[in-house]
Amino acid sequence: MLKDRFIADIIASKESLVGGRVRVCGWAYRIRDLGRLKFILVRDRSGVIQATVKRGESPEDALRAAEDLKLESVVCVEGELRQAPTREGVEVKVERLEVLSTPVEPLPLEVEGSEKASLPTRLKYRWLDIRNPMVSAIFELEAMVAKVFRDYYWSQGFVEIFTPKIVAAGTESGAEVFPVVYFDKTAFLAQSPQFYKQFAVIAGLERVFEIGPVFRAEPHHTSRHLNEYHSLDIEVGFIESYNDVMNYVEGFMRAIVRMLEEDGRRVLELYGVELPRIPASGIPKIPLRKAYEILEEKYGKKVEYGEDLDSEGERLMGAYAGEELDSDFVFIVEYPWKVRPFYTMRKDDEPSWTYSFDLLYRGLEIVTGGQREHRYHRLLENLRDKGLDAESFQFYLDFFKHGAPPHGGAGMGLERIVMQTLKLENIREARMLPRDTERITP
């Protein structure tokens, strides 16, 4: 390996390394030429360190390599680690400078300060944008959230599954699916692993989770939607009610907050955002019908009875939770049947309403879930009431013919969780290579 440690590792161990020889590999982030002395800031994924090349001290080959060095050249430097009046408290006195690669044309996007450029430009030259430590921190956090998800649900007795992404039918009517060429059959990209999460529970795995891509053919042009994103999904059998599912979702949110407190402080400080708040008593739950009243009485916003919340309604309910309940999270529960999928369990005493929920995080829906209908005959009724053809979903209905436990689950948007944690303006910032109605490259 050309590189055996990150810059952050060197800085963390600087007391024991000062006076010794170190090797640093990364990109030339800044170059300052003072004639006889040249300062090169070398950046890698973990941080930045200063390297100094000085005439009369550094070897001639190092001086020659430094002479024509360009920004964003890939370099390896070797030399003595010594104390210096830098932010890191150390620098590398260069004894060897190796240029592994150099730009062949002017940079179309300056790495330093790239977050201030227009978003289309940043996404067009994403490989340069992500070199900016401010931007790469987003994806470090995203990886940390995914790891917390996996670790938390493993600890709760869940099994990780890997479901098909080429499917025979959408989870709904098929209006929001991407068709794909699949030999002589009709097929689509999966909107959700919903059917196969339920399959796994019914097949006896009982508690399952998945991290995977989902695809939505919705012609949105908003700062909150993507046509491809990563979904964090759970499904759990033998529940008493949908409250059991919400408890598992809340457990994951608390695990995220612990991670941020212990390992994510650097990223939060980089973005100047505070730790998310969850009351000790639990994430508050507000029935949607109560939310209608709150929105009208407190904010003068009227929502038609039986309708879903729009983005403004979600934002205002998030503000209400923050101001009145001291929580950055709030569950909105009992959604109308007409705005929920056919597999959602309806209330026996109020069939126009369902055992379902959304979780809002700082005013944006990041989780949708609920209890599923596990009774075969009720599923047939639900399909009929939705005006859907049962024959198109027969492969799914077959799962329920031989004993299905009461179960429920949730789908969580990874990018939305990161977006709300860092208070990003656009969800595309939280996706390494976003796909939307206008973008399919890079």
From Swiss-Prot:
List the InterPro entries: Aa-tRNA-synt_II, aa-tRNA-synth_II, aa-tRNA-synth_II/BPL/LPL, Asp-tRNA_synthase_2, Asp/Asn-tRNA-synth_IIb, NA-bd_OB-fold, NA-bd_OB_tRNA
Which chain positions carry the site (Important for tRNA non-discrimination)? P85
Q: What is its EC number?
A: 6.1.1.23
Recorded catalytic activity of this chain's protein: tRNA(Asx) + L-aspartate + ATP = L-aspartyl-tRNA(Asx) + AMP + diphosphate
Q: Which cofactor is essential here?
A: Mg(2+)
Name any GO cellular component annotation: cytosol
Where do the annotations place Mg(2+) 2 binding?
E365, T368
> Record-annotated residues binding L-aspartate?
E172, R216, T368, R372
Q: What top-tier enzyme class does this entry carry?
A: ligase
| UniProt protein name | Aspartate--tRNA(Asp/Asn) ligase
